[in-house]
Amino acid sequence: MAANMYRVGDYVYFENSSSNPYLIRRIEELNKTASGNVEAKVVCFYRRRDISNTLIMLADKHAKETEEESETPVEADLTEKQKHQLKHRELFLSRQYESLPATHIRGKCSVALLNETESVLSYLDKEDTFFYSLVYDPSVKTLLADKGEIRVGPKYQADIPDMLPEDSDEREQSKLEVKVWDPNSPLTDRQIDQFLVVARAVGTFARALDCSSSVRQPSLHMSAAAASRDITLFHAMDTLYRHGYDLSSAISVLVPLGGPVLCRDEMEEWSASEACLFEEALEKYGKDFNDIRQDFLPWKSLTSIIEYYYMWKTTDRYVQQKRLKAAEAESKLKQVYIPTYKPNPNQISSSNGKAGTVNGAVGTQFQPQSALLGRACESCYATQSHQWYSWGPPNMQCRLCATCWLYWKKYGGLKMPTQSDEEKSPSPTAEDPRARSHMSRQALQGMPVRNTGSPKSAVKTRQAFFLRTTYFTKIARQVCKSTLRLRQAARRPFVAINYAAIRAEYADRHAELSGSPLKSRSTRKPLSCIIGYLEIHPAKKPNVIRSPPSLQTPATKRMLAAPNHTSLSILGKRNYSHHNGLDGPERWLSR
């Protein structure tokens, strides 16, 4: 019961395909839809097989630099098998959220930030344990470090010079700091409080006279509350200090000839629409003020946004939203029970419904039973297992035992490293649009490409097509030779041709040539007339000057090629030389 109970904050496996590895996600919320189903709002984690080849190289470079800086080498004592399996435990965190049906959850796992003080073998020794150190942004395809680094060592630390003898400080102390209040003033606390009450009253009266403030603060109570904020009190205390704590002169400054002084803070400077935008941005980005300013409030300064945030937290609106969020969190689902589902569709079973014990002793829904004889596990090469699973495209006839199949689903790779994995560099992923068209189906799924020798496994030929040139295009080639310049264009295939200039020149030349008559094509005489003319006028044979017999050189004679008795290929029972237009070895003999 507890194994199938999933709560908010758990790291879980999600199955989006019966043949692909599990997705690794962290549950953020559990929401119940209108239809009664449960959806999970999750944070996405990506495997190495999910990102591009370039980013994998950057991640390996970052890991190598981290290993060089650390005192204990990370992969010094690891075998090739352990290094291969360690790559399957590495994940990449993302800030991307998605909603998935809770019924697709297939188990729990554990994901932690890479601990540099802990041995990497601890991740291999624990089941369903993963680690991450970099953050992947799927929108811009970049990798970033998830935590800041404290760089320790002579490379990053400053050289501390020797202590110098004490000298007199020649700096002007008046420029270093400014005194704004004197606690030893001649006024008592009661007199200062009375002056602050006068400053609040002046601020309330100033808001009553200001038209824009009257719109924002329609009632006297709200105007008095706005005048009682810190900016009014700070201005009053600063005015009192600047006038030597003389109450009469300070009050005269608060109420000059032009009218009372009005002091506003960020709460009053912001409009209602700007406040709504700020709350929307805060709901989306949290306290990431740089993103809030960039996407929602670019006309506000960062200082203004931060100041408004801490003032906004003191308002009743913030308290109300906090209570609403607490009530929503209380009403949301805290956990969900997902029962064990039916067997995987890739499971191979015999005709009587019992699981096979030997790979090849049972049949599948894809291949006949005779085609599976002698097939072993593609990962560990075992020939016996209590259950077998079809792996890869059906025409590949690949199978995995129960242990390797579970490893493939959880960790996204084969348990045992293959020779091709050791020799080749990481292949491009399906996310790269330039490489996707050149990858086969099994390569897109991260499976090895195997050549079985069967014509079924060959790549299908694409549908043939041809490009038909229009009549006007053929005319434009002749009319616009100076602009088109076909020879230069052929030598530069990646430089675009200016079709607009060609079209304009063709229109001008076509108007010029439309008035001139076209040259009529000469009609060809029939063959009977040509034969009659040749009979009447036979061709004269040229006089050939023959040399004496002693000066004649032996004429060479080309002999037929000797038959090539090499082995016949499948291509029409002819060898490679015949299919490429070659006659084999030739011998030249003199007559």
UniProtKB/Swiss-Prot annotation:
Residues 421-435 have a biased composition (Basic and acidic residues). Its main location: nucleus. One of its GO terms (cellular component) is nucleoplasm. GO terms for biological process: cell population proliferation; chromatin remodeling; G2/M transition of mitotic cell cycle; granulosa cell proliferation; negative regulation of DNA-templated transcription; positive regulation of DNA-templated transcription; positive regulation of G2/M transition of mitotic cell cycle; positive regulation of granulosa cell proliferation. It holds the Pfam family ELM2. The modification Phosphoserine is found at residues 425, 427, 516. Residues 1-147 form the BAH domain. Residues 265-317 form the SANT domain. A zinc finger (GATA-type) spans 377-404. SMART domains: BAH, ELM2, SANT, ZnF_GATA. The modification Phosphothreonine is found at residue 452. Residues 148-258 form the ELM2 domain. Keywords: Cytoplasm, DNA-binding, Metal-binding, Nucleus, Phosphoprotein, Zinc, Zinc-finger. Acts as a component of the histone deacetylase NuRD complex which participates in the remodeling of chromatin. Plays a role in maintenance of the normal epithelial architecture through the repression of SNAI1 transcription in a histone deacetylase-dependent manner, and thus the regulation of E-cadherin levels. Contributes to transcriptional repression by BCL6. This is Metastasis-associated protein MTA3. The gene is Mta3.
